[in-house]
Amino acid sequence: MSLAVFSPCDVASKLLSEVVGEKYPKVDDDDSIVEPVTSLCLPQLSYEDFHHFSVIPLWNKTFPCRLATEWNPKNKKDAPPKKKNALVILERVASRSNQNAVSRVINILRSKVHLMFSSSNELPSSEDVERWKKSPETLAASEYGCNLFIQFLKEQTSENEVDFWLDCQKFRSSKMSSRQNEARRIFDEYFAMGSPKKIYIERYLWCVVQAYLVNDPGWRHTFDVAQAYVGLKLAKKSHKKFLEDPLYLDLVELVTSGVNYNKFWHDKLE
């Protein structure tokens, strides 16, 4: 699809007129069918659902049947509404520069068997773990807490969608010189036919992303709407749910028990 457009909103408007008429657009060559674009299975939209309020006008252009109210404060000093718990923590994870340490912690957290053989100095203190209960922000301040939460999100939703959201967030701050190649990498990894990490979205939205890739000057907005679409699927009170999840509760029991770490997990796994 080739569109002679000059702004992201122009892309959305043009595609809407071309695609919205399809009753059941196809997603892939396997003839999978998705819901019509006019009946997206998403919750009621509010400010807190969007990672950046600047994305809302573009979202409304793309999905006029699922409008979100734009934030127009009467006073410039008014604080913006709080974002969804998960978005606060995801943004912190995406901004971290030490990705090797992040990956190492995630590998430890993937299974209790790995954690069983980890050393005590790789674990947070009981005070740190208790502090995570205060708010999403205090959890986000902990690298270990962030990555435990990411593992929780992946188990609750989709690993590929969480990875896609994080890649999009890092893409937003990427250098202009590398943005074209990075945009192509993200598209190939999450949208290309046959990709093992492919995320499944509306055919219409897939076309929108493809059009941004070709026509968006600077590629700054290429994945804005797709990232928002994935973010809308995350539970609004995910911080509370995380604190009730066995992944967190088991860690609390471990760091507060004062027993030998290996013995603790040996007993848990029997």
Curated annotation (Swiss-Prot):
It holds the Pfam family RGS. Residues 135-252 form the RGS domain. InterPro entries: RGS, RGS_sf, RGS_subdomain_2. Disruption phenotype: Sterility and embryonic lethality. It comes from the Eukaryota. One of its GO terms (biological process) is negative regulation of signal transduction. Keywords: Developmental protein, Signal transduction inhibitor. SMART domains: RGS (SM00315). Shown to have a role in viability and embryogenesis. This is Regulator of G-protein signaling rgs-10.
